[in-house]
């Protein structure tokens, strides 16, 4: 931008000192039209996106995460390639459940909701797949919802896909 302004100022100084008036007027009108179009384009972009967005776009290559992800990035690996899934913060639902593991013999129940979080997914639906407790290495799980309902899931039964 500074380079363009320097070139324009140089042309203006040159043509102000030039002796041919018609050529001077023609070149000055071209310069002013160009300046007007550049500022018009910049102002339209600025008014649509805002200064903060423009600055973040310029600096996004230095940031670890893209500027529009609101720190909701799910990283996963598929066929030996790493992928990132960006989830809009308004789409994430608060969990209204917890999952308990029933240990055999002792009868103690352990909260394993955080351990299963990668399989549960950001929308709390197990990525729309049918998963058994045996797939996760458990024999019996209890899903307790916030309204008080309990679902006992045995080793070969499917976990509920709608947890919220």
Swiss-Prot record:
Positions bearing carbohydrate: 88
Signal sequence bounds: 1-18
Matches recorded under InterPro entries: DUF5772
Alphabetized UniProt keyword annotations: Glycoprotein, Signal
Pfam family of the protein (one): DUF5772
Family that this chain belongs to: Belongs to the IIV-6 357R family.
Protein name: Uncharacterized protein 357R
């Amino acid at each position: 931008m500074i380079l363009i302004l320097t070139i324009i100022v140089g042309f203006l100084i040159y043509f102000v000192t030039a002796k041919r008036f018609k050529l001077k007027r023609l070149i000055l009108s071209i310069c002013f039209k160009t300046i007007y179009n550049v500022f018009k384009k910049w102002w339209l972009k600025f008014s649509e996106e805002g200064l903060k967005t423009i600055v973040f776009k310029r600096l996004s290559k230095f940031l670890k995460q893209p500027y529009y992800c609101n720190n909701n990035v799910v990283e996963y690996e598929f066929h030996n390639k790493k992928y990132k899934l960006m989830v809009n913060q308004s789409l994430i639902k608060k969990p209204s459940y917890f999952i308990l593991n029933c240990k055999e013999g002792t009868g103690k129940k352990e909260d394993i909701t955080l351990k299963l979080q990668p399989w549960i997914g950001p929308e709390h639906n197990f990525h729309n797949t049918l998963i058994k407790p045996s797939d996760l290495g458990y024999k019996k799980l209890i899903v307790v919802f916030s309204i008080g309902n309990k679902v006992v899931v045995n080793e070969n039964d499917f976990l509920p896909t709608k947890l919220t």
